[in-house]
Regions:
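The conserved cystathionine-beta-synthase
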Residues: 16-35, 41, 87-105, 112, ...
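Tandem CBS (Bateman) regulatory domains
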Residues: 1-13, 52-85, 98, 122-150, ...
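A glycine-centered beta-loop-beta connector
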Residues: 30, 38-54, 101, 109-124, ...
Length: 272
């Protein structure tokens, strides 16, 4: 069996950010490039950190008092970035990269060739390959989905939902009506729809900025889930019982759940 390498799955090019960029600039770059993270390079063009949409959201720029808001507006990418940057050689086996990401809870790796950054490999890249493979074992969504997820009512404010996400570490929250029917999903990227990161009034509800829920049958295959994520550019899907589609979702399956499955010793990715 031919070994799939990182170079076979990665996407070339790196969206860069300067250490002194403001959080407003970071948010603008994330939105313009439709990415979840930016790599930060110093003056010598060496990677020194990474900042994500979740980092921006976790910053208390959502604070209601003017003093906190002023502090956050003065903060830079350097102050919120994570370091050091996790990197991988371009000719590393893709299975090894997937295992490393799963074990370390890493969503992306900076790809280097001859010590120079040439691209990025992320969970989405593995999903694209999974969706295209017909040799995958047919595990079901219900086998690997997460039973726990963050949920809020349709009357919840954006600021309250964002703080709950920041405090709990969840990247999104499922919005439901009084009966538990899923109405949408609110994520960190939805926050970027607010221009110039102005203070968000407490009167703005999650229903005003959430995106429509993407749902899948609990008996669907992982390949079907991966294809759905790729087609809709989503990182997570609500898992439902089709006979009770208007009830509270059974769980959530994320792109990271799929990569974790790839890292299992008996996965086709770990063979050959």
């Amino acid at each position: 069996m031919v070994t799939t390498l990182v170079r076979d799955l990665m996407h070339r090019g790196v969206v860069k950010c300067e250490p002194d960029n403001s959080l407003g600039k970071v948010a603008k770059l994330l939105a313009e490039h439709h990415v979840h993270s930016l790599f930060i390079f110093n003056e010598e063009q060496l990677p020194i950190g990474v900042i994500t949409d979740f980092d921006v959201m976790a910053g208390e720029w959502l604070s209601g008092d003017p003093e906190s808001l002023a502090v956050m507006r003065d903060m830079t990418a350097r102050e919120l970035m994570s370091s050091p940057v996790e990197m991988v050689e371009i000719d590393t086996a893709a299975s090894e990269a997937a295992k490393r990401m799963q074990e370390g809870g890493i969503r992306r790796l900076l790809v280097v060739e001859n010590d120079l950054p040439v691209g990025v490999i992320s969970v989405s890249d593995f999903l694209s390959d999974i969706a295209a493979k017909s040799i995958l074992r047919r595990e079901l969504v219900s086998d690997v989905m997460s039973d726990a997820y963050l949920v809020c009512r349709d009357k919840t404010s954006v600021t309250a939902a964002a703080r709950a996400m920041s405090d709990s570490g969840w990247r999104s929250v499922v919005v439901v009506d009084p009966h538990g029917k899923p109405l949408g999903v609110f994520s960190g990227l939805d926050l970027l729809s607010f221009p110039d990161q102005e203070r968000i009034p407490d009167t703005v509800l999650v229903t005003e900025v959430m995106h429509p829920p993407l749902m899948i049958d609990m008996d669907a295959t992982l390949q079907e889930a991966a294809q759905m994520m790729i087609d809709h550019h989503h990182h997570r899907i609500l898992v439902v019982d089709p006979t009770h589609a208007d009830s509270l979702p059974l769980g959530v399956i994320s792109s990271f759940d799929v990569v974790s499955e790839m890292a299992r010793p008996d996965s086709v990715w770990q063979q050959g």
